[in-house]
């Protein structure tokens, strides 16, 4: 088991790395050349800048039972097809049961934006979201390290 972090725009990198250290789990950070992260306790993979370049690097690197942290539904779908675990920065676990609905919602939102509509962005991040993420990550590591 490894923890792979889609670090571009990810607010929980430090929380994930703390859990990886505590559980003695190998950690990898993926970012493009515009967002280089160098963190102790993790191997950083820097990919060329480009649409979804970090996502494809993760999809090619992920193995069965890895944990991937991302907010990208497309990447989550690819990760699930590799029998890995995938959660977002709020601690929501992507599953075979919910990914199709999430991808459809993303498609619908894109159609609204392309038609000139506006979709409200997320509210400011809270400490409760950090706690929820941390608890979920610990729960997943304990579930699969038994």
Locations of the language-model features?
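Nuclease catalytic cores that cleave nucleic-acid phosphodiester bonds
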Residues: 2-146
């Amino acid at each position: 088991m490894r923890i792979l972090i889609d670090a571009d725009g990810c607010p929980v990198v430090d929380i994930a790395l703390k859990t990886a250290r505590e559980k003695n789990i190998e950690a990898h950070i993926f970012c493009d050349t515009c967002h280089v992260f160098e963190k102790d306790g993790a191997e950083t993979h820097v990919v060329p800048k480009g649409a979804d370049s970090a996502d494809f690097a993760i999809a090619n690197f992920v193995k069965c039972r890895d944990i991937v942290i991302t907010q990208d539904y497309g990447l989550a779908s690819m990760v699930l097809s590799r029998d890995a675990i995938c959660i977002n920065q709020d601690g929501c676990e992507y599953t075979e049961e919910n990914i199709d609905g999430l991808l459809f919602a993303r498609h619908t939102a894109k159609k609204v934006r392309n038609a000139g509509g506006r979709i409200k962005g997320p509210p400011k991040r809270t400490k409760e979201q950090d706690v929820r993420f941390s608890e979920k990550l610990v729960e997943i590591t304990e579930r699969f390290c038994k």
